[in-house]
Structure formats: structure tokens, C-alpha cells
A protein has these predicted regions:
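Conserved glycine-rich Rossmann-like NAD(P)H-binding loop of the short-chain dehydrogenase/reductase
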Residues: 41-55
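The beta1-alpha1 cofactor-binding region of Rossmann-like NAD(H)/NADP(H)-dependent oxidoreductases
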Residues: 71-82
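Conserved mid-core segment of classical short-chain dehydrogenase/reductases
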Residues: 103-117, 160-163
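Active-site helix of classical SDR
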Residues: 131, 167
Length: 331
């Protein structure tokens, strides 16, 4: 193996630990794969779109990460088991898995039934499928690290994000249930609860009602330095916590403050969120992905405010081959 170049698909350190990031062709998933690779892991990245995975592989290899790509849809439990079988046959046991595949549906009620179906299939059933595929081998070994990316929206309901909130509430419950079920087994489960991050995910979110106006508020909020954090910083926090076996990883100051306030006074926080919801755009009949909704938002002030969000789109492979809001490739 010594003649393999750094970052090639068959790495130099064949005995290095293996991590699987489910939903890693862009956004937070890509940042997590990079951080795990820099920590010495051989990293398996999966997503639904081969072209975006290939571009992600190039970006990771440029950083010296040993990476393997497998096209995989987290909604398919059989496909998840196939990923595990393929990795175990070539690289060995999966030591760490992080389920991060996600999508955003932003808009007022009422929302389509398929918006709920897609959100729950990807962000609740997806982690269930991934964990159930990798868990048997971990249980045999009595060792493993599992991370499930939920959201502060899984703790505190957020206006205009009801399908997302519903799915993340479920994922959070699944993750916490796993934590208790596996306590003392040698397998740690980390429930990851991020606030807003500058991952470029606004570019692929689906906006309904008044797409341009929904895109404007969501993108501006996700770009503000105090409100959100850079994806690579988020990845360091997550990977560090997962590898240390922390059961709860919650971050951004607004998320920490919101969690505390909601536990102390859910009624007061609910009133505040209701007031904020009334300031958001009203209903409408249109639905567009972010990269289309963006065309209708051209003010100079918006352009200045959202500079960090645009840079994140470029940095984290959001302008990939697949221009759709539901690729489930990492928020």
C-alpha cells in the first residue's frame, strides 16, 4: 500500500479507522467528512447523486482525505445494508457513522402532504435505516460511535419550517432512545443539535408560498455571524463530540439560549415565536428551490448581508450537478 498517493481511494493507512457520513456530497455532510479525514479516518461518503459525490471526492482528496464514494439513498433500508456490506468487504468495520442527510422545506401552512413525506423519509427514516444497518456489527464488537444530526428545530418548533420540525423532532427522539438503549454497551450515540450554520443549504431548500420572500428572510438569517456559524467550525464541534462519545452536542449561542429558555418557559418562547411567525411572508401558490427563488431577490442590501451565505454555497459544493431541493446530500 505504500505506493498509494495521499487521498487516493485505497489509502496508505489501511488499518486506520473507518467513518461513514450518510449525506456527504455537500454542505455539513461534506464538512464532516473533511474533518473526520483530517482526524485520520478513512471516510466513506454517500449520497444519491453520483456527479455531486465525484465532485465531493475531488474536494476531499485535495485536502488529503482518504475517501470512498457510494451512491446511496438513505430512504432505502436494503441499500443501507448494502453500503455496510461493501465497506466491510473492502475497508473493514465501520467505527463511526454520522447520519446527516437532510432537506429544508420553508414556507407557511398549509404545506403539501409530500413535503411531510419527504422530510420524514429522509430525516427520520434515513437515520433509522443507517443506524440499523451498521449497528449489528458494532454490537458484535461492543464498540462504535454513532452521531445523528437533528436540529434546534427538533427542540423548539420554528414557524414556516413545520415539515422540517416534525422530522427533526422524530430524529431527536430516535437518537435519545438509542442513547439509553445502548448505554453501557460500548457504543455511544450522540444527539447533534445545531443551530443555524453557514453550509450553503439555503441554495437547495424548497421555498413555498412566496418563494422569493421566504428565500430572502431565511438566507439573510443564516448568513448573520452572531446567529450562525461556519460549517467547518460546526464540523469540528460535531466530530470532536462524537469521537468523545458525548450524548448531547448542542451549539451556536442562540441554540443554547433557546434550549434553556424553552425549558424554563415554553409558553413565553411560544408567544415570541408566534409573533415572529406573523412577521414572515404570507401564503401563496408557488414553490421553488433556492437557486431559482434567488433570482427574484436582487437588492444591494441583501447582497451585502448574505455574502457569507454565498461563499458557503461555493465552498461546500452546493452548486453541484444536481440542482434540486431534495437530494438529501447534507444540509
Amino acid at each position: 500500500m505504500s505506493d498509494q498517493r495521499p487521498g487516493s481511494e485505497v489509502p496508505r493507512g489501511f488499518g486506520a479507522p473507518v467513518a461513514w457520513v450518510a449525506g456527504a456530497s455537500r454542505g455539513l455532510g461534506l464538512a464532516l467528512a473533511r474533518e473526520l479525514g483530517l482526524a485520520g479516518y478513512r471516510v466513506v461518503i454517500t449520497a444519491r447523486t453520483a456527479a455531486d459525490l465525484e465532485r465531493a471526492r475531488e474536494l476531499l482528496q485535495a485536502d488529503g482525505v482518504s475517501v470512498r464514494t457510494i451512491v446511496h439513498d438513505v430512504r432505502d433500508p436494503v441499500a443501507a445494508r448494502d453500503v455496510v456490506a461493501e465497506v466491510e468487504a473492502t475497508w473493514g468495520s465501520i467505527d463511526t457513522v454520522i447520519a446527516v442527510a437532510g432537506l429544508m422545506k420553508v414556507g407557511p401552512l398549509p404545506q403539501r402532504a409530500e413535503d411531510y413525506d419527504q422530510s420524514i423519509d429522509i430525516m427520520l427514516r434515513g437515520p433509522i435505516n443507517v443506524v440499523h444497518a451498521v449497528l449489528p456489527s458494532m454490537q458484535v464488537r461492543g464498540d462504535g460511535r454513532i452521531g445523528i444530526v437533528t436540529s434546534i428545530a427538533g427542540l423548539i418548533p420554528v414557524p414556516h419550517l413545520v415539515p422540517y420540525t416534525a422530522a427533526k423532532f422524530g430524529a431527536l427522539g430516535f437518537s435519545r432512545g438509542l442513547t439509553e438503549e445502548l448505554r453501557g454497551s460500548g457504543i455511544s450515540v450522540s444527539t447533534i443539535i445545531p443551530g443555524l450554520m453557514r453550509t450553503g443549504g439555503h441554495w437547495h431548500a424548497d421555498y413555498s408560498g412566496q418563494p422569493g420572500n421566504e428565500y430572502a428572510w431565511f438566507t439573510a438569517l443564516s448568513a448573520l455571524p452572531v446567529i450562525s456559524i461556519e460549517a467547518d467550525r460546526a464540523a469540528k464541534i460535531i466530530v470532536g463530540g462524537v469521537l468523545r462519545g458525548r450524548s448531547k452536542i448542542i451549539f451556536t449561542l442562540p441554540a443554547l439560549a433557546g434550549d434553556l429558555l424553552y425549558r424554563l418557559s415554553p409558553e413565553a418562547v411560544g408567544l415570541l415565536l408566534g409573533w415572529a411567525g406573523r412577521l414572515l411572508p404570507g401564503p401563496g401558490d408557488d414553490q421553488q428551490p433556492g437557486f431559482r427563488a434567488a433570482r427574484g431577490v436582487t437588492s444591494d442590501a441583501f447582497t451585502r448581508i448574505t455574502g457569507p451565505a454565498r461563499r458557503a454555497v461555493r465552498r461546500w459544493n452546493q452548486q453541484g450537478a444536481h440542482q434540486s431541493g431534495g437530494d438529501a446530500s447534507g444540509s
